[in-house]
């Protein structure tokens, strides 16, 4: 198989067949669910790569037994990435050509997968309440602010989170020493252990851990 998932490794150049790949993926996902005779209550889609799932679910699969009561939610992690493709790729979807219009799948004469997901989903979520508000503005809406404003009553911002009953430094059995708000000594022991493990040369410096892209958007500047 090829290296890379969405684009050529070491570049920002997308694979030329991305539209075909993710059309196949979206339809294939629903086909598998149908063949397994699973009757899902909710299908959760993420970003443009699954944007056509809500479209298929509400059109080609709407009358199928296993999907009649299924709801679908589309999560937008980063509105910059929308899955724009040429008009001719509409033919690959197998969807009715009439859906290629400004209300549904068309976006400045291109096919827009994420727009389809937003329009056809029952609910839309994104990574925070603030971002949910921002993407309804011209400054951050990436051209889809009108569509998102129209769906504002179905748009929710949900923060990423953790289970504090498991990831709790006061009780966690996987760290060198436990600590909490009233007992911070264990935190220093954990820091020293981390520095020894990874051979970090500077001892008297702050250590910050972040799971994120190295991008200005994340506030790293």
Segments (PLM) and residue ranges:
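Catalytic cores of nucleotide-sugar-dependent glycosyltransferases that transfer UDP/GDP/TDP-activated
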Residues: 1-221
């Amino acid at each position: 198989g090829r290296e890379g998932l969405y684009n050529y490794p070491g570049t920002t150049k997308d694979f030329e067949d991305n539209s075909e790949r993710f059309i196949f993926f979206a339809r294939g996902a629903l086909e598998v669910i149908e063949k397994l005779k699973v009757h899902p209550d909710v299908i959760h889609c993420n970003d443009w790569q699954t944007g056509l799932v809500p479209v298929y679910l509400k059109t080609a699969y709407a009358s199928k037994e296993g999907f009649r009561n299924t709801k679908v939610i589309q999560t937008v992690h980063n509105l910059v990435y929308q899955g724009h493709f040429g008009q001719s790729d509409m033919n690959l979807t197998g969807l009715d050509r009439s859906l290629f219009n400004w209300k549904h799948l068309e976006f400045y004469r291109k096919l827009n997968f994420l727009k389809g997901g937003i329009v056809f989903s029952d609910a839309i979520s994104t990574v925070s309440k603030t971002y949910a508000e921002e993407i309804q503005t011209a400054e951050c809406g990436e051209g889809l602010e009108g569509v998102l404003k129209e769906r504002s009553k179905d748009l929710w911002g949900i923060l990423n989170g953790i289970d504090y009953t498991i990831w709790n430094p006061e009780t966690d059995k996987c760290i060198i020493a436990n600590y909490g708000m009233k007992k911070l000594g264990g935190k220093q022991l954990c820091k020293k252990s981390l520095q020894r493990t990874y051979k970090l040369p500077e001892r008297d410096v702050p250590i910050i851990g972040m799971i994120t892209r190295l991008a200005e958007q994340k506030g790293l500047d």
